[in-house]
Amino acid sequence: MIREIVMPLQLTLTEGILPKGQEKLAFARLSEAMLKWHGLTGNKVMAPNVIGEYRVLPRDETFSGMQEAPVAIIEWKVPSFAFTDREVQLGYFAEATDIIFEMSGGKQPRDRIFINVVHTVDGAWNFNGHAMTNAEIGEQVAKGG
């Protein structure tokens, strides 16, 4: 069985949602939660492969309901076998929402914290410098446990 793995995180925040300078901590906490929910905390192969970026956008550049609004968007791009377990989906989404809500001091409404997952096609994942299948990724991750 292939163990689920995680990869790039793109965190997009409207300016002012988090106290200035807390974006890196939010990124780290969201990444750690992802590893935890996939049973990969401490995995030596996965830790260096959790990559990504955060962006802080001006208030007039983020929208909800087609209106300007402060939003937090947590988006993961992962191999097609990640996030397939409903318990992982529910658990991670709840924890990630809590992280942003708490770090905002309770100011960011939970209904303006959005999370989604984008799956890649099997074999179209760049891991260790070349395209790998889900099975090949699973073999590499198993070595890091």
What spans do the regions from the language model cover?
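A domain-level signal for the structural core that forms small-molecule/cofactor-binding pockets
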Residues: I2-G145
